[in-house]
Amino acid sequence: MSQPCKDSDAKLRAACDRCHELKIRCTRTGGTESRCDRCEKNDIDCVYRAHRRIGRPKSQKSRCGPNTTARQNDTTTRGRIQQEQQEQMDISPPENRDSINSDFDFSIFEASGAVEWHRSSDVINVSTHQVSSTHPPFISPDCSLSHESSMSQTGSGSPFSMLNIGTMPVCDLDLSTLHGYGPSTDLVRSINHRSGSENESMEGNAELQSTQSASGSPQEEDQMLEDRLLRHQAKLRCLYSTVDATRNLISTTNDTVSHGAPLDKVLEAIMELVEILQTNANHTSSSSSSNSTTVDGPSEIRNQSRSRQDIANFNDIAILHVSISYAYIVKILAPIILSLEKSSVPVGSTSSSTYNDTTAHPSSASLPSQTGGPTKPRTVSVSLGSFSLASKPALNAQILLGMISRMLDQLHDATQPILMQVRHHHVPTQPVALQEREHHDAAMTREQHVSTGHGPDRHTSPVLSSAQAAVDSIRNEEKELLAKLNKVGNSTSATW
């Protein structure tokens, strides 16, 4: 039976509670005292409530009994829960997107500017890193596993915060995707704009890898060393692409804008490579001393497993990465030192030449400005707090050249054993461009790398041939670079 309100003065709704909640028409063919057709069919209670007043409620109690009020509250709560469940069912789940677990944002390839980075020579050889495909992914200068904004704060967390210049994005390649090349279910890390996070992530990765290498097997240590060197090589390639892109633009537009890479990033790259080499040398000396105290069988097996490694515990692939990285550094420093040399004139000269630091994004750093002209040069000046040498270009250039000279000497001492070993192999190779040598090395299969990296015929290894070609390609530039730095150092010491 229908359960209307007992008070005859109360005006009831035209629909029962259930029909009102479901927003359907409520009909009673059995009369006013019977249940509605729907409640009669479903054999449920049919309650007709009074109209709710709009505004402030009356002070007197509800004219309906307490049982009716409790039933109304239960019905309202149950209807609200059903409505929320229906809304949740209507919301479709988001589609899963395949992504690469890397610091590279591969969507940037489609948004590249006027400069085409999809060249076959832009392939870095990672076939020996257990890549399932013979065509590893391209290494683009528009790279981001820690992609910093080009206008981030200067020198945050950097040992070169004294240089009053900006920063640029740096590749942070996740080697886990190269070991198992293919789609992953993890999302790519979004581009962040927190200054200093790039340096912190680099230091954290270096500490983690050094900690793991202390307790890993020889194969794991070799793999982690190759990973660190490949990361460093990718970062240097980003810096070199800035120089190369600007040089190509100048040759096509006949502009006279100086080209160069951010000096603070170049100095950081030199320090990082020196740190990698010194860390590996210290670990090698400690492990060799511990192995010499052991005369059991496992030590002999371990020594046999390390028989293919070269000086400082470097194998062929590590030697190749070091050679290419050193060649990149020489090529990047060449235009910087040339521009600074013009600025380091004797005191009293009116020359005001400056090194133009293109600190913008690699794909747009060398492009013309929005007004149609070339990009405006930025002066690199040494600053310590409020003290700055921006008004003293000659002294500023001499100090910068002194910093570069000292750091390049450290790098030369750290890489000299490896480079000397590469040069003494006497592999007959023709001098080719550095990027063409990378493309040739990337076209090799894993079987070729492995088969040529062992045994007494190692001097014919194509990997060492590539390393020697990279070193030979910058032989003249290296001599000129060191001669200029020595000349500047002698003139600076005589002036001071």
Swiss-Prot record:
One GO cellular component term noted in the UniProt record for this chain: nucleus
**GO MF, any single term:** DNA binding
Intracellular or extracellular location(s): Nucleus
Pfam families given in the database record? Zn_clus (PF00172)
Q: Where is the composition biased (Low complexity)?
A: 281-294
Q: Where is this region: Disordered?
A: 57-102, 189-224, 281-307, 348-379, 444-470
Disulfide bridges in this chain: none
Leader sequence residues? none
* Keywords for this protein: DNA-binding, Metal-binding, Nucleus, Transcription, Transcription regulation, Zinc
Q: Which InterPro entries match?
A: Zn2-C6_fun-type_DNA-bd_sf, Zn2Cys6_DnaBD
- Give start-end positions of Polar residues composition bias: 65-89, 207-218, 355-379
Would the keyword Lipoprotein be found if you checked this record's keyword annotation?
no
DNA-binding residues: 16-46
Q: Where is the composition biased (Basic and acidic residues)?
A: 444-460
Instruction: Please tell me whether the keyword Metal-binding is annotated for this protein.
Output: yes
- What is its biological role? Transcription regulator that specifically up-regulates the gene cluster that mediates the biosynthesis of fusarielins F, G and H, decaketide compounds with 5 methylations and a decaline core that act as mycoestrogens as they stimulate growth of MCF-7 breast cancer cells. Probably binds the 5'-CGGNNNCCG-3' motif present in the promoter of all the cluster genes.
Q: Give the protein's recorded name.
A: Fusarielin biosynthesis cluster transcription factor FSL7
Q: What gene does this protein come from?
A: FSL7
